[in-house]
UniProtKB/Swiss-Prot annotation:
The lineage of its organism: Eukaryota, Metazoa, Chordata, Craniata, Vertebrata. This is Epidermal growth factor receptor kinase substrate 8. Homodimer. Part of a complex consisting of ABI1, EPS8 and SOS1. Interacts with MYO15A and WHRN. Interacts with LANCL1. Interacts with EGFR; mediates EPS8 phosphorylation. Interacts with BAIAP2. Interacts with SHB. Residues 649-822 are annotated as: Effector region. Ubiquitinated by the SCF(FBXW5) E3 ubiquitin-protein ligase complex during G2 phase, leading to its transient degradation and subsequent cell shape changes required to allow mitotic progression. Reappears at the midzone of dividing cells. It is found in: Cytoplasm, Cell cortex; Cell projection, Ruffle membrane; Cell projection, Growth cone; Cell projection, Stereocilium. Keywords: Actin-binding, Cell membrane, Cell projection, Cytoplasm, Deafness, Membrane, Non-syndromic deafness, Phosphoprotein, SH3 domain, Synapse, Synaptosome, Ubl conjugation. It comes from Homo sapiens. The modification Phosphoserine is found at S58, S476, S625, S659, S662, S685, S811, S815. The modification Phosphothreonine is found at T223, T317, T629. The effector region is required for activating the Rac-specific guanine nucleotide exchange factor (GEF) activity. It mediates both barbed-end actin capping and actin bundling activities. The capping activity is mediated by an amphipathic helix that binds within the hydrophobic pocket at the barbed ends of actin blocking further addition of actin monomers, while the bundling activity is mediated by a compact 4 helix bundle, which contacts 3 actin subunits along the filament. Residues 1-39, 202-225, 298-320, 612-689, 787-822 are annotated as: Disordered.
Length: 822
């Protein structure tokens, strides 16, 4: 971020002295100046080689360094601000509160003054004559800013001196300080000139100062949430146009979530929401700082008599600049994404509730809209669109003023995806956070919207695979008696099934998605037995939730029977088969001994019951099965994805459905197959059919009870803190909760009692994650109260027991004495 610039172009960058960190300008020929040709590496070497022989008079003594202006303090005894150390101490406090706002600029040193120059416009912001610089000091490794240059300046018109602090990265503060001090010394008129030696010393410091890179940094490796979204725009657009509103399948996708999956997803969404709120708060503070600088600048200009700039006005002018438009657009996108998350989390968060946070967000939203001069810029932000649930939630929550602001932002803030034309491309939104944080991936089928977008976009890249799936779906539709049911095929493609192919443009992708009804589909009946056996190793424990799934333990070796969907059908070493999610499996080489296909002992599984009570394969063509239940006949049709699509219309003969999606799907298929068998085999009466169905249902219940499988949980040590905890305990606890280093360093110096004494506002002031810290502290306090309450109860019971024992003891002694007297 920091750098430095000199005055002449070169092949190494903007200026020739960029390699050695200073901008001293040796003598060049007039021809070089006129033609402005770029200096070659050899010429640059010769210039540096001859520099030592140049006379002092031939050196222009101008050097430039790229620095970050951190802050400026007025040295005043009333504010306990007297020395540079006082300024560094206050800088640390501001840094802990997140209130240091850096500004990139160029610090120029010549034989008359130290100047600050705007990096973009190259205008001079400040000019400190050397005789006004009272003190120059380098402060190294004293805080998170490890190379701070301190300048104490006082112009004749000032009553109190100013302390300016700069962070110097590429050229360290001690070198710049030596340059400035030598210039001050030479300006006082000594016989021995110090500055040429100082510049030579900086020049010789080349090995410790690496040159800036010639090329930009390479792009980081893509993650699931950040994978070349632009290159898949055309593919995703074609898919979106073909499928419509991509939000609909998500509603059904989450119905099979286990409590653990839901808790992980909610925790992830809460983390994203917290980071969004932090970034919005940071941006609002940045706007406020710019407004304060502008107000102070206006006040100074109003009170100023002459046209000459006063001390500090140049830096104020730079700080008064508003953020660039890209940052405004990013902030508006985070507002919209935040509203979507609040609608998702409205049933899961409290203190503050989702409605409270909506009201909280509309205040800064209004500020940002006003800062842009009206709603035009906000109205241009298309992605992300608000979900239908979000729009309903906002309609129910907002008050009159908030509704007026919301409506002024237009259709991009008020219409869900279904209300936009199918052919209009809505780019997927992947949030980028200021501190570089990325949301954690969820290792189960409840993938995030960003992951779904990537997987869906990637699926289009492999057209052949998509056509095969379309044919399978069409085949299933033709053979299914439940004509109203449509499998959820195509909404949650697994990224590891598809390989990256050449990207299609939008037109080609759209053509690829058109149904190919004239193709023959018998090739899909090719038996799976002809394929070589494949095996996978389980990465985690998995507990089956119904009879179609298979419970596995970590490191189990499983034979893959069908891997064409997101849930794979596998067989374990005992011969039991069922479905498991593919993201807990790793493909492995076949074991030498093989798993064997010996018939396992008889167990009441749903697969065997279907073979006994269902129709024979020869009697009935295959029918599609709702996810994740496998087909009841041994025809190798792939299982559907585990995201069930509810049946909107079912035949009248289906009267009962189990609450489990798998059992429900199974009953639909069984009923449909039974009714298709009736015209062929009428030997059974209606009463026998009812008895068979009753026996079937009861047997399924018994087999489900027998298939319960408990996986032992690993004992994870829990770290807690109390009022007696040491600062080291507090630091360990903060690290165990996953707080960032700024929070750990800011609060890790406190003991337990000090940490518990802070309220929410104080925590937010000290660290950016104050709200999360406060929530965790509240949990710890509640746990301490529970434990202390039980301890107090035990103490009361112990004392009461002692009293009873003492009373009984006294009574026994008295009786003995009485007996003796008698």
């Amino acid at each position: 971020m920091n750098g430095h610039i000199s005055n002449h172009p070169s092949s190494f960058g903007m200026y020739p002295s960029q390699m050695n960190g200073y901008g001293s300008s040796p003598t060049f020929s007039q021809t070089d100046r006129e033609h402005g040709s770029k200096t070659s590496a050899k010429a640059l070497y010769e210039q540096r080689k001859n520099y030592a022989r140049d006379s002092v008079s031939s050196v222009s003594d101008i050097s430039q360094y790229r620095v970050e202006h951190l802050t400026t303090f007025v040295l005043d005894r009333k504010d306990a601000m007297i020395t540079v150390d006082d300024g560094i101490r206050k800088l640390k406090l501001l840094d802990a509160k997140g209130k240091v706002w850096t500004q990139d600029m160029i610090l120029q040193v010549d034989d008359r003054a130290v100047s600050l120059i705007d990096l973009e416009s190259k205008n001079e912001l400040e000019n400190f004559p050397l005789n006004t610089i009272q003190h120059c000091q380098a402060v190294m490794h004293s805080c998170s800013y490890d190379s701070v240059l301190a300048l104490v300046c006082k112009e004749p018109t000032q009553n109190k001196p100013d302390l300016h602090l700069f962070q110097c990265d590429e050229v360290k503060a001690n070198l710049i300080s030596e340059d400035i001090e030598s210039a001050i010394s030479d300006s006082k008129g000594g016989k021995q000139k110090r500055r040429p030696d100082a510049l030579r010393m900086i020049s010789n410091a080349d090995p410790s100062i690496p040159p800036p890179p010639r090329a930009p940094a390479p792009a980081p490796p893509g993650t699931v949430t950040q994978v070349d979204v632009r290159s898949r725009v055309a593919a995703w657009s074609a898919w979106a146009a073909d499928q419509g509103d991509f939000e609909k399948p998500r509603q059904y996708h989450e119905q099979e979530e286990t409590p653990e999956m839901m808790a992980a997803r909610i925790d992830r969404d809460v983390q994203i929401l917290n980071h969004i709120l932090d970034d919005i708060e940071f941006f609002i503070t940045k706007l406020q700082k710019a407004a304060e600088a502008f107000s102070e600048l206006s006040k100074r200009k109003k009170n100023k008599k002459g046209k000459r700039k006063g001390p500090g006005e140049g830096v104020l002018t730079l700080r008064a600049k508003p953020p660039p438009p890209d940052e405004f657009l990013d902030c508006f996108q985070k507002f919209k994404h935040g509203f979507n998350l609040l609608a998702k989390l409205k049933s899961h968060i409290q203190n503050p509730s989702a409605a409270d946070l909506v009201h909280f967000l509309f205040t800064p939203l209004n500020m940002v809209v006003q800062a842009t001069g009206g709603p035009e810029l906000a109205s241009s932000v298309l992605s992300p669109l608000l979900n239908k649930d979000t729009i309903d939630f906002l309609n129910y929550t907002v008050n009159g003023d908030e509704r007026q602001l919301w409506m002024s932002l237009g259709g991009t803030w008020m219409k869900a995806r279904a209300e936009w034309p199918k052919e209009q491309f809505i780019p997927p939104y992947v949030p980028r956070f200021r501190n570089g944080w990325e949301p954690p991936m969820l290792n189960f089928m409840g993938a995030t919207m960003e992951q779904d977008l990537y997987q869906l976009a990637e699926s289009v890249a492999n057209v052949a695979e998509h056509q095969r799936k379309q044919e399978i779906k069409r085949l299933s539709t033709e053979h299914s008696s439940v004509s109203e049911y449509h499998p959820a095929d195509g909404y949650a493609f697994s990224s590891n099934i598809y390989t990256r192919g050449s990207h299609l443009d939008q037109g080609e992708a759209a053509v690829a998605f058109k149904p190919t009804s004239n193709r023959h589909i018998d090739r899909n009946y090719e038996p799976l037995k002809t394929q070589p056996k494949k095996y996978a190793k389980s990465k985690y424990d998995f507990v089956a939730r119904n009879n179609s799934e298979l419970s596995v333990l970590k490191d189990d070796i499983l034979e893959i029977l069908d891997d064409r969907k997101q849930w794979w059908k596998v067989r374990n070493a005992s011969g039991d088969s069922g479905f498991v999610p593919n993201n807990i499996l790793d493909i492995v080489r076949p074991p030498e001994s093989g798993l064997g296909r010996a018939d396992p002992p008889y167990t009441h599984t749903i697969q065997k019951q279907r073979m006994e009570y269902g129709p024979r394969p020869a009697d009935t063509p295959p029918a599609p099965s709702p996810p994740p239940t496998p087909a009841p006949v041994p025809v190798p049709l792939p299982p559907s994805t585990p995201a069930p699509v509810p049946v909107s219309k079912v035949p009248a003969n289906i009267t009962r459905q189990n609450s489990s999606s798998s059992d429900s799907g199974g009953s639909i298929v069984r009923d449909s197959q039974r009714h298709k068998q009736l015209p062929v085999d009428r030997r059974k009466s209606q009463m026998e059919e009812v008895q068979d169905e009753l026996i079937h249902r009861l047997t399924i219940g018994r087999s489900a009870a027998q298939k319960k499988f408990h996986v032992p949980r690993q004992n994870v040590p829990v770290i807690n803190i109390t009022y007696d905890s040491t600062p080291e305990d507090v630091k360990t606890w903060l690290q165990s909760k996953g707080f960032n280093p700024v929070t750990v360093n800011s609060l890790g110096v406190l003991n337990g009692a000090q940490l518990f004494s802070l309220n929410k506002d104080e925590l937010r002031t000290v660290c950016p994650e104050g709200a999360r810290v406060y929530s965790q502290i509240t949990v710890q306090k509640a746990a301490l109260e529970d434990s202390s309450g039980s301890s107090e109860l035990q103490e009361i019971m112990r004392r009461r027991q002692e009293k009873i024992s003492a009373a009984a003891s006294d009574s026994g002694v008295e009786s003995f004495d009485e007996g003796s007297s008698h």
